[in-house]
């Protein structure tokens, strides 16, 4: 008879921190939302793929909003009330992810775009011919 494997639950640190930083990375294929404290330690995270969207649906604005709401709910359970928002990337889920944070009840104090802009660095991909 096979031995049963015991599953251990992840321990979630319950800290009451009122302020944090929301990092939104929006690419053309996915949107990743990470919420950290002011030191940079991760409190919660979510992405369009982790919420349940697959394939081309991950790149939709609705998937980005759902991912942002999921991450915000997890962090608000740990006591987060105010947050700064740092947005990186040029994907379709930039603005809707911020709206998802506002809809979930998180108070936003700052929105900053930290997208890296090349000074004529890498060559861009060729244009699609359909």
UniProtKB/Swiss-Prot annotation:
GO terms for biological process: translation. It is found in: Plastid, Chloroplast. Keywords: Chloroplast, Plastid, Ribonucleoprotein, Ribosomal protein, RNA-binding, rRNA-binding. One of its GO terms (cellular component) is ribonucleoprotein complex. GO terms for molecular function: rRNA binding; structural constituent of ribosome. PANTHER family: 40S RIBOSOMAL PROTEIN S14/30S RIBOSOMAL PROTEIN S11. Belongs to the universal ribosomal protein uS11 family. This is Small ribosomal subunit protein uS11c. It comes from Tupiella akineta.
């Amino acid at each position: 008879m096979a031995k049963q494997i015991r599953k251990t639950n992840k321990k979630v640190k319950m800290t009451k921190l009122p302020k944090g930083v929301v990092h939104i990375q929006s690419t053309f294929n996915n949107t990743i939302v990470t919420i950290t404290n002011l030191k940079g330690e991760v409190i919660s995270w979510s992405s369009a793929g982790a919420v349940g969207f697959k394939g081309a649906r991950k790149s939709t604005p609705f998937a980005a909003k759902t991912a942002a709401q999921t991450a915000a709910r997890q962090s608000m359970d740990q006591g987060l009330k105010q947050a700064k928002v740092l947005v990186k990337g040029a994907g379709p889920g930039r603005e809707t992810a911020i709206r998802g944070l506002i809809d979930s009840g998180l108070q936003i104090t700052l929105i900053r775009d930290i997208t890296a802009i090349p000074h004529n660095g890498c060559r861009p991909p060729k244009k699609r011919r359909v």
